Amino acid sequence: MIGNILLNVRYLLAPILIIVAGAGVLIGGIMAWLGVVLLFVGLIVDIATKFETTGVGYDENGDTLGWASFQNLTMYFMLPVFILFQLVMAYRVYTFMALGGAEGAVVMEIIPGLLVMHEGITAMNLIGATLSSGIFIGIGIIYGHELSHTKGFGFVISRTMMALSGSAHFCYAHVYNHHLELASEDDPATAPRGRTIYGHYPLSYLGQSKFLFNMEKERLARMGVSFISWQNRWIRGYLMAVPTVALFFAAGGWVGMACLATIWGISNFELEALNYLEHYGLIRVKDQPIDYRHNWDNSTAFTSWFFIEIGRQADHHDRGETHFWELENVGCPNTGWGYFVVFFIALVPPIWHWYMRKRLAAWDTHFATDEEKAIANRINKEVGYEGTPFAGDVLQDAGNVDLGMRTAKK
């Protein structure tokens, strides 16, 4: 019983830390930087927990050990957490403007003599609050991703969460573009070899928005409805963000707008970073089946628990509507480290290319089809990946194992 409880509550890591980061913003002072500190703590923990883990598993009757109601309620709960986080940040913008950047009077002594909450916030700590908000609102987006694969109430929650994060196009573009065009030139979310994470961010974000724009244009034309219409899900999605924009503008005018733009910029950078890390450099010939090999998997402990198994990309792309706690490790190519580690590696492009080109060389040798190899050889010449040796990683031997690959549903 205790083991079953631990299997399920381990996925509360991110919600708890999101709430803690939000509390830091509310308290203000040096605590406004708590979210930034927690990001680096996450990196250390990710390094220390490189060991592999599994999903919740099944009992002797073949029934999942996952608590569906508990996990779904947790994901739904993240929407009010999102809203409260934004309200708290807007409050801090308001107090900054009202008191001219002074801390003002002590409102509450949380730990007498050690930790107090001031009425206002300094400019430096407002920067910390903004960065903390961007980081942990971005981390919370993983719940919007998970619910985008559901229908009904769950999808509405996802759509609202993504709209409040400045990424209203995501729910449709992710399901109807990324999951169908994965690792091909028609998928803006897949980063080709040689591209940096900084170059990928705007191209992926705008490319996915363009996809939904075009999809709605064609859909409404077939219906005989004007593009400028409430039925346009591209327009309607971005309008859902208007209350957030109004809130921050009312709180601090253009200072509020700058804070919101920074928060959205960071949170969406994290979202596109996940796309970048999960499929970087992988190649699929258009109209050929999507296979397990078209994903970089990860099943290290902290990444799996914190990011609710999002690292099991191969199984996720095969069974998109499967609950995250039921996803399995299917023996796919692996980047070797957890998401915190590879994210920080990706922030330094020369190190990232050095790190990944060796893994891509192994992928070309052990996983790619002849057609994919031909494309890879051409691209490798163009971006300077040609002739890269590979040694010293389990990926080298992975291609010699029968992975039992299934063709992903399209």
Model features per residue range: what roles?
Residues 2-50, 66-94, 105-136, 229-272, ...:
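Alpha-helical bilayer-embedded segments of polytopic membrane proteins, i.e.
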Residues 2-15, 155-232, 266-410:
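Cytosolic/stromal cytosol-facing helical appendages immediately following the last transmembrane segment
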Residues 60-205:
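Intramembrane catalytic core of multi-pass membrane enzymes that act on lipidic substrates
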Residues 57-82, 290-300, 329-335:
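Juxtamembrane helix-capping/reentrant segments at transmembrane boundaries
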Residues 45-60, 142-146:
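C-terminal ends of transmembrane helices
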Residues 30, 51-55, 90-98, 146-150, ...:
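Transmembrane helix-loop junctions in multipass membrane proteins, especially transporters and channels
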Residues 40-44, 146, 254, 280, ...:
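Conformational gate/switch positions in structured elements
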Residues 148-149, 244, 275:
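Hydrophobic side chains within alpha-helical segments
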